[in-house]
Amino acid sequence: MVKLLDCTTRDGGYCTDWNFSDEYIFDLMSVLNKNKFSFYEIGYRNYYERNGKGPFYYCTSDFIKKFFDKKNNLQIGVMVDTKRFNETDFPNGNTDSVDFVRIATHPEMIKQTLSVAEILYERNYNVMLQLMDMKNLLTEHYDLLKKWKYKDIAETVYLADTYGEINASDLEIIYKKLKETGYKNISFHAHNKKQLALSNSIKAIKLGAYSIDVTQDGTWA
C-alpha cells in the first residue's frame, strides 16, 4: 500500500514564513496518526538565508524535540536544500530529533546531492532524495543517478512537479525513465497550478509509487 507523507508545515511555511503554533502542530500530528500517515515532514533544516524566517525553516533538534517525543507512529523528518546544506546542522541521526532527512535538489546539483546523501547516511540519518523540476531532468542527470554506487541508502527518490506543469503522460514517461536507473522506491510530490495534483498523484499510485505527498487543505499546492 502506498505511504503518505504530510508536508503541510514545510511547504506551507511559504505562506506563514515558517511560523506555526505548538497547538496547530500537535493537532495536525493527531490527525495524521488517526489517518495512518507514515511520514510528517515538519519543516526545513536550512543553514543559509534564514533572515525573516520562523523556526520551522531551520528546525533545530532542540526545537522539534517536543513534537518528536509525542510523534506516536509517525516518522518525523526535515527537508534540506542541497545549496543550503551545512554539515554542522546534522551531527548524528542517533541523537537527533528526526527520523529522516529529505534532500531537495534541482537537476544541475544532483552530483552534489548524492555526496550530501552519503554524508548524512554515514552519520546515521535515514535519507530520501527529491528531484525538483522533474520535467527538466536530462540524460546526463539520469546517468548520474544510475551510476551512483549507493542507491540503497535512499529510502525513496521523489519526483517533484515543482512548477505544477506536468500531466499524467509526462509523469509516466519520467517515472519509467527513473525506474530504469535502478531505484526500487519512487515517490511523487505534486503541485496544483493546472488543477492536476490529485489526478497526477493517482497516476503515480497506479505506476507503483512508494509514497505520495499531501498537505492539509491543499496548503501551498
Language model features by range: what are they?
Residues M1-D17, N73, D96, N126-M132, ...:
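N-terminal small/glycine-rich loop or linker at the start of catalytic domains
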Residues M1-K66, K70:
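Conserved N-terminal beta1-alpha1 strand-loop-helix module at the mouth
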Residues D11-G13, Y48-K53, K83-E87, H106-I110, ...:
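Short, small-residue-enriched loops and turns at beta-alpha junctions
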Residues G12, L32, V101, V157, ...:
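Conserved, mostly hydrophobic/aromatic
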Residues F39, Y44-K147:
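Active-site beta->alpha loop and helix N-cap motifs at the rims of alpha/beta catalytic domains
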Residues Y125-D170, I174, L178-T181:
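Glycine/proline-rich, positively charged
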Residues T156-A221:
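Catalytic alpha/beta core domains of metabolic enzymes, predominantly
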